[in-house]
Structure formats: structure tokens, C-alpha cells
């Protein structure tokens, strides 16, 4: 009976399950309507199609598997993007606080941070969103609806990587301030190393949540390759031509 299918859907939902229902007949309409995701077949009745959220035009259940794979992969890519952004923010925030404690001027200028934000908000989104879906996500258990997108593993990764980056940059800043003296060349080196750390962090983000190396099928990730090249080229242009606007001076090997 149609009500039996609907009761099953309601019972599963009460237990916190995310329920998807497929159907092609009029009697499937109540279950399709009450499910979180209703999937009707292209050859089904108009009643079933109207009650569903989407229609499988090719009547192929493999399309459902592909949709789940893409959904899980997109969720993971969003986690990677959040990880990348928060690592940059944690590092920059601690550097500003640390720099004020040792009495140095702002280690990063406003225009330099605008370039870093462009890397974070635009280029990183392009690179990480363009990563292809991974087959290994289908082996994972379904997430609970109450799960926070930043899980414990990601939170620890953000803290550890952010502190490592801060420790390296703060040590460099302290050396320039107390030993070598802060000059335009030193500040340019500091800024470039900071950007290169975020450039490398894209590889950390790519491998986040995966058992595979960040270099797995590296050459096939054209979107990531393009973004990595743009960041390198942009940083080179800023160092060579930025001048007073970016508080940079051209660097050579001796510097």
C-alpha cells in the first residue's frame, strides 16, 4: 500500500536518517513527497514526477550513485576550502599579534593582505572546487545531519598547520628585527615566504581527508595547476614591480 512506503520513510526520518526514495507510479507519490530526496523515473507517471525532487531521465540507478559521489566530493572540497582559509587567517592573526609584542611595524601591509585574500577567496576556491570527484568517498559511512562541517580532524589540522606556519614566520620576523635588521629586502622576503607557505598549503588542502598523496594524478588537475601558476606569476610580478604600493623591492639570489 502507498501508506506503507510513507510510514517507512517517516520512521527512518525519526531515527535521524536521510531518506531518498525512487518510484515511477502514482502509488509512490506520498513516499516521494515525504522523503528528503524524491527520485522519479523518466518513464514514470506525471503524478510521481510532480511529487519528486528530481527525475532520472535515463531511468538509470547509476545516475543516483554518481549524484551521491559528486555530493560527497563537493562536501569534502568545501571542507578543504575552509581548512585552507582558516589556516591563512590563523597565521596572519597570530603574526599581527606577535609582531606588536616585539615592537615591529606591521609585517604585512594592507595591499599585501589584499593579494593574500585574493589567493584565499578566489584562487583557492577555483582550485579546490575544480577537483574531480573521488571514488573513495563512496566507502565512507553516511554523515549525520547534526555533524559540523569542521570535524575534530580538520580542527586539529587547522591548529597544527597554523601554529607551524606562525612559528616559522614569527621566528623569521624576530631574526630580522633583532639580528639582521628590518630592511625593504627583508620585508619582501618575509612577504614572499608567507605567500609561498599558502601556496604549499593548497597541497595540504588537496590531500585533506584523503589517503592519497596530494600529487596523485597531479598533472590531470588542470584547474589546480592553473591556479598554482597564477599565484607564482602574480607573486613574481608583485615583487618585481610592486614598489611602494606593495612595499616590495626586486630580489636577487644574493638577497
Predicted features along the sequence, with ranges:
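Basic, alpha-helical nucleic-acid-binding regions used in initiation and control of genome expression
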Residues: 32
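Membrane-embedded transport module
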Residues: 2-20, 35, 42-210
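Extracellular/periplasmic helix-loop-helix junctions in multi-pass membrane proteins
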Residues: 179-182, 240-255
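Hydrophobic alpha-helical transmembrane segments in multi-pass integral membrane proteins
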Residues: 165-174, 229-245
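Hydrophobic alpha-helical membrane segments
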Residues: 196, 201, 223-238
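C-terminal membrane-solvent junction of multi-pass transporters and transport-like membrane proteins
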Residues: 149-150, 154, 209-230
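Conserved Rossmann-like nucleotide-cofactor binding loop
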Residues: 27
Amino acid at each position: 500500500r502507498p501508506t506503507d512506503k510513507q510510514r517507512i520513510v517517516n520512521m527512518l526520518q525519526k531515527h535521524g536518517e536521510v531518506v531518498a526514495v525512487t518510484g515511477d507510479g502514482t502509488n509512490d507519490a506520498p513516499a516521494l513527497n515525504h522523503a528528503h530526496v524524491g527520485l522519479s523515473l523518466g518513464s514514470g507517471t506525471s503524478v510521481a514526477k510532480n511529487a519528486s525532487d528530481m527525475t532520472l531521465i535515463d531511468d538509470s540507478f547509476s545516475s543516483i550513485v554518481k549524484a551521491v559521489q559528486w555530493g560527497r566530493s563537493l562536501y569534502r572540497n568545501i571542507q578543504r576550502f575552509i581548512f585552507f582559509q582558516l589556516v591563512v587567517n590563523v597565521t596572519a592573526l597570530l603574526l599581527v599579534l606577535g609582531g606588536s609584542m616585539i615592537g615591529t611595524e606591521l609585517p604585512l601591509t594592507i595591499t599585501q593582505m589584499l593579494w593574500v585574500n585574493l589567493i584565499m577567496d578566489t584562487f583557492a576556491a577555483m582550485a579546490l572546487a575544480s577537483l574531480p570527484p573521488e571514488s573513495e568517498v563512496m566507502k565512507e559511512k553516511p554523515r549525520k545531519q547534526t555533524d559540523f562541517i569542521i570535524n575534530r580532524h580538520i580542527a586539529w589540522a587547522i591548529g597544527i598547520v597554523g601554529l607551524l606556519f606562525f612559528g616559522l614566520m614569527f621566528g623569521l620576523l624576530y631574526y630580522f628585527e633583532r639580528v639582521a635588521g628590518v630592511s625593504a629586502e627583508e620585508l619582501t622576503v618575509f612577504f614572499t615566504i608567507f605567500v609561498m607557505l599558502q601556496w604549499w598549503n593548497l597541497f595540504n588542502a588537496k590531500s585533506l581527508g584523503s589517503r592519497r598523496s596530494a600529487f596523485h594524478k597531479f598533472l590531470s588537475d588542470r584547474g589546480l595547476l592553473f591556479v598554482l601558476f597564477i599565484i607564482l606569476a602574480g607573486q613574481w610580478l608583485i615583487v618585481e614591480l610592486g614598489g611602494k604600493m606593495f612595499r616590495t623591492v626586486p630580489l636577487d639570489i644574493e638577497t
